[in-house]
């Protein structure tokens, strides 16, 4: 949900009773502490705005570990949000980690039917991560956006349960 043409999802327009009853898990990587702290803060703020008092927060080492954690949690939650940041270095490692996280999280969502909010930043520079982390002066708040998308999808899918 970024860039030109991104939808506007206002959590206050969701049925407050439905949204507040959702069980939400947030799985967050640990690399790049400043950026991750911003992403997690934005995610927790979005959960609170939706009326979710206590989302489950699980920390994992890195973005590569996000899919396995999301897979373990998904059957027990209405929505899962994965937060991480991968910054390009001088080797193909960036490409492998980004591909593994993206395809792994997509697989979890499709296989379980549980929405997985994608809050993994794939950046060329640390500054790009800071600009998207919801920190003071940031241009975007991807942690907040990932929770908003996951919860909106979960509420929509509840009608088909």
From Swiss-Prot:
Pathway: Cofactor biosynthesis; riboflavin biosynthesis; riboflavin from 2-hydroxy-3-oxobutyl phosphate and 5-amino-6-(D-ribitylamino)uracil: step 1/2
Reactions mediated catalytically: (2S)-2-hydroxy-3-oxobutyl phosphate + 5-amino-6-(D-ribitylamino)uracil = 6,7-dimethyl-8-(1-D-ribityl)lumazine + phosphate + 2 H2O + H(+)
Annotated (2S)-2-hydroxy-3-oxobutyl phosphate binding sites: 90-91, 132
UniProt binding sites for 5-amino-6-(D-ribitylamino)uracil: 31, 63-65, 85-87, 118
GO biological process: riboflavin biosynthetic process
InterPro entries listed in its UniProt record: LS, LS/RS, LS/RS_sf
Active-site residues (renumbered): 93 (proton donor)
PANTHER family listed in its UniProt record: 6,7-DIMETHYL-8-RIBITYLLUMAZINE SYNTHASE (PTHR21058:SF0), 6,7-DIMETHYL-8-RIBITYLLUMAZINE SYNTHASE DMRL SYNTHASE LUMAZINE SYNTHASE (PTHR21058)
Protein task: Catalyzes the formation of 6,7-dimethyl-8-ribityllumazine by condensation of 5-amino-6-(D-ribitylamino)uracil with 3,4-dihydroxy-2-butanone 4-phosphate. This is the penultimate step in the biosynthesis of riboflavin.
Protein name as catalogued: 6,7-dimethyl-8-ribityllumazine synthase
Organism of provenance: Paenarthrobacter aurescens (strain TC1)
């Amino acid at each position: 949900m970024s860039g030109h043409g991104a939808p506007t999802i206002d959590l206050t327009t969701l049925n407050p009773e439905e949204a507040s009853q959702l069980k939400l898990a947030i799985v967050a990587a640990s690399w790049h502490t400043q950026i991750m702290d911003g992403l997690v803060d934005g995610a927790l703020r979005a959960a609170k705005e939706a009326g979710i008092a206590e989302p489950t927060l699980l920390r994992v080492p890195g973005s590569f570990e996000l899919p396995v954690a999301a897979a373990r949690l998904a059957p027990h939650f209405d929505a899962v949000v994965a937060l991480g940041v991968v910054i390009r270095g001088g080797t193909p490692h960036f490409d492998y980690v980004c591909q593994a996280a993206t395809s792994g999280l997509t697989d979890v969502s499709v296989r379980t039917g549980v929405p997985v909010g994608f809050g993994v930043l794939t950046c060329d520079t640390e500054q790009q991560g800071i600009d998207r982390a919801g920190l003071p002066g940031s241009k975007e708040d991807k942690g907040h956006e990932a929770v908003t998308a996951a919860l909106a999808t979960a509420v929509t899918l509840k009608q088909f349960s």
